[in-house]
């Protein structure tokens, strides 16, 4: 089960969206795969600096908070697209309370 959020001038749940819909150069995306202990960190080339910072902070803090730093944080765009294209959609959002505790 994948959980995710899109960060683009705010934080939006990625629930029921296909990875191809959200992995754009304008967005930053954090997708959590708890079963496989992977966190996908997508930072679009045209995304704002603030959004890139928030996405990176969220991904790395989720790693420590949920996995004690043991999860694999994947940032290579080609790897992200290849691995996530096997999933039809994002199943759920990352809890707002967890995001709030990390980003404030």
What is the meaning of each model-derived region?
Residues 1-104:
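Long, low-complexity regulatory segments enriched in Ser/Thr/Pro/Gly and acidic residues
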């Amino acid at each position: 089960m994948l959980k995710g959020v899109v960060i683009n001038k705010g934080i939006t749940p990625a629930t029921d969206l296909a990875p191809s819909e959200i992995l754009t150069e304008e967005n930053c995306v954090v997708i959590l795969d708890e079963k496989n202990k992977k966190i996908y960190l997508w930072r679009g080339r045209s995304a704002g600096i603030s959004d890139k910072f928030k996405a990176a902070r969220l991904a790395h803090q989720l790693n420590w908070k949920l996995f004690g730093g043991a999860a694999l944080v994947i940032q290579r765009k080609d790897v992200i697209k290849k691995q996530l294209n096997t999933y039809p959609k994002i199943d759920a959002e990352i809890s707002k309370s967890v995001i709030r505790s990390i980003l404030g």
